[in-house]
Structure formats: C-alpha cells, structure tokens
Amino acid sequence: MSVLKEYRTVSEVVGPLMIVDQVAGVHYNELVDITLHNGERRKGQVLEVQGDKAMVQLFEGSTGINLAKTKVRFTGHSLELAVSEDMVGRIFDGMGQPIDGGPELIPEKYLDIDGQAINPVARDYPDEFIQTGISAIDHLNTLVRGQKLPVFSGSGLPHNELAAQIARQATVLNSDDNFAVVFAAMGITFEEAEFFMNDLRETGAIDRSVLFINLANDPAIERIATPRIALTTAEYLAYEKGMHVLVIMTDMTNYCEALREVSAARREVPGRRGYPGYLYTNLSTLYERAGRLIGKKGSVTQIPILTMPEDDITHPIPDLTGYITEGQIILSQELYKNGFRPPINVLPSLSRLKDKGSGEGKTRQDHAATMNQLFAAYAQGKQAKELAVVLGESALSETDKLYVAFTNRFEEEYINQGFYTNRSIEESLDLGWELLSILPRTELKRIKDDMLDRYLPKADTTMTKVFVAND
C-alpha cells in the first residue's frame, strides 16, 4: 500500500483555486484532501498539472486558508460517489451528502462521478414512450426513453413548476419495470429548494426520487460537480439495478456561469460571451450520458432545463445545448402573460425522436396524424389572428374564423392544463380530436379518411356562429 505524501507548499490562492508547488506523481482530476491550520478539512480536485505545480479547485471555498500552514494531500484517485439503492427517496446536497436527517447510507460501491465513455456501438436506439402527463409534450413533442430533451425557459417563467410537475407525473407506460427520477437543482435559492422538497414530499413523488440540491450560496465548484453526481446515481440505478431513470437538471445556466467563473479564475482565454472555449465539450460530457445500452434493462433519460439570458435562443448556452441534444421544449413569455400554464410554445418546440415513441403499440395509431394536423391548424390559426389585427376581423373568411376559434380553444384548453393536471396520452389524443372537430372535415388534410371516420367527433349542428375572442 503506497503512502500518501503530504505537501505544505501552497504558493497562491485565487478565488476557488489553489496552486501547490513541488509536487510529483499528481494526476488530472485527482481528489485532494486539504487540512487548514485550525484542523478544518476540505476537499479539492486537480484541474491542471504543469511541471511540479498543481492547480487545485476547492469545493468548499478558499476562505481562511493560510498559505504557510495549510497541508495538502493527493489521494491518488478521482472524486467518487458512494452509491446505494437506498438513495431513492432521499435528499442530498450538491456533493452527495444526505441533508434530510435520514439514516446513514451504507454504500454498495464507489463510482467515479465522471462516468465511463459509452461505446456508440453499445448504444440501443431510444424508442419507448415516456408519459409526462403534459399534452404539449406527450402528444406534440413526445419524450422517448433514452432521449435528452431540454427545456428552454426565460427569466420569470415557471420552469421550476414545470420541472416539479414532470418529476411528479412522469412514467413509462406498458412496463412493470421500476421507474425513478433523479433531480439535480443547481444554484437555486432557499425558497426554490423548499418548493422542490415540499412539492415532492406532499405529493409522494419523493418515494421514487433522488434529490440533489446545490444552493446559490454554495461554491461554484460544487455546482460543477452536482450534475455529474446526479448522473452517476442515475447510471448506477439504470445499468446496475435495471431501473428507468429520468434525470431533471435545473438550471444549466447556473452551471455554465460556474464554469465561466472558474475559467476566469484560471485566467483562460475566454470564448463567446466570456464562456470558456470548451463549453460545448463540457456540456457534451453531461448530455451524452443519456441513453440505453444493448443488453441492459435500464435507461437514462434527460430533461435539462436552462434559462435563456434575455430570452436569446442564440446565446451560447441554448445554442450549444441544441446542437448536442435531440430537440427542445420552449416556454413562451406571451403565453405566460396571458395566463396559460404551462406556457409551452409548441410551434418552435421539437422532439427529434417523437416519431420513434408514438404509434400503435406505444401510444395509439392516430398519434402521428393528429399531431401533424394540430401543428398545421394552430400555425394557420395564428396567422389568421395576426391578419385580423392588421386588417380587422371583417377581412377574415368563414374558414379563417374557424381557425381562430380553434387556436383560442387550443391555447385555453389544450396548452393551459395547469401544473397539477395529469393527462394520460389517451386524454390528450381525445382532446385533440375534439378541438379538430371545430374545423371542416375538408380542412383536415393530414389525416386519412378511415382515421377520420373512426375518431373524429360528429359536428355540432346547433352551432351556427363562431365567436372570435379579442386579444
């Protein structure tokens, strides 16, 4: 057994970073034990090694460090997480330490939080439907097991409520397999942390969840570790315990801000908007940990949530996230101001794998056809409403007025389901058919006649007028 060497050669401390001189045999990502002059112990991780100098990032901050009296010991291994199936139903801090007052966990093993690279050949194709209970996602932007589908939010929008709703309601249909939610909250306030903990406890969703909470006043370095710790937990539950795991990570913008803070402390050359040039690579090490493996029963599905600075979808964080992931769910300021909850803007939203998780045997045979028809009708109705604003309602044809009526009801009944309504996919499909019945059958050109005969409700012959709601 090798003896760990202790160093007292700390030469500099800058923000969350510490420089240790005259080191030997130190490796990148190695875990570091730090003992202060008063006996307090802290943890760190090697960020960079140049010659006999090691740059260490501190997990608990640098306050109170005395350069001459601080002892540093390199452990010889990277940061590891003690994992156990008993983690389900528990609440942890951003570094994986229990904070719920529950019993001490007995680790089944220790896993590197950076995970293992997945051979692309070993990946299985995502093709099983996950029901979130939200019509705008399940019906129009279907989430598939093993997919990574981000939510693009904006300042002041209720993405926390949406995240909690998905955590409560998500399930895999037609399966007896265990389902779990791993929830990673990064850089949130005390109020937001209380909301998530209370919501999951009161609804009973905590019984199938693992919650990691990194607060806004916690060190930035911890914020960088939190999603990796959450994903390590998810991979353990999925690939070693055979569970289907949904990982919800919010807010990825706070994570990227922590990366920028550490990069600035390292005096690295900044990239776009001051973020490090390796932001894309760094995000991919998180997002690419979603998926299914051939021969493994479990799966890891991701819903990362981010706040777009100034609602700018071209900002580096949503821009790079969109390149790596398989679609996006976009929340709308306009829908939110009009009182619609959740304010999901379905037209620019997209799930690139939605066709793989829908259809007979997975949802229902009319899923794809009604999805396409709803998209087309809603887009045409929005155009008709814009035309009415410019030219007046008198300029609209009778068909245009029907499209406007459809659009109003679509937003009020379909999108605006609230944060505590859990709709099955059958209920979403049936509601879609009910709304499509507002339009003449001749306008439903994206649905085959035999499907119209089977599912389309009979028109209400007593309706002689269509009233167009004024915005």
Swiss-Prot record:
It comes from Streptococcus pyogenes serotype M49 (strain NZ131). SUPFAM superfamilies: C-terminal domain of alpha and beta subunits of F1 ATP synthase (SSF47917), P-loop containing nucleoside triphosphate hydrolases (SSF52540). InterPro entries: ATP-synt_VA_C (IPR055190), ATPase_a/bsu_AS (IPR020003), ATPase_F1/V1/A1_a/bsu_N (IPR004100), ATPase_F1/V1/A1_a/bsu_nucl-bd (IPR000194), P-loop_NTPase (IPR027417), V-ATPase_su_B/beta (IPR022879). PANTHER family: V-TYPE PROTON ATPASE SUBUNIT B. Disulfide bonds: none annotated. Produces ATP from ADP in the presence of a proton gradient across the membrane. The V-type beta chain is a regulatory subunit. HAMAP family: ATP_synth_B_arch. GO terms for molecular function: ATP binding; proton-transporting ATP synthase activity, rotational mechanism. Transmembrane segments: none annotated. Pfam families: ATP-synt_ab (PF00006), ATP-synt_ab_N (PF02874), ATP-synt_VA_C (PF22919). The keyword Secreted does not apply. This is V-type ATP synthase beta chain. Keywords: ATP synthesis, Hydrogen ion transport, Ion transport, Transport.
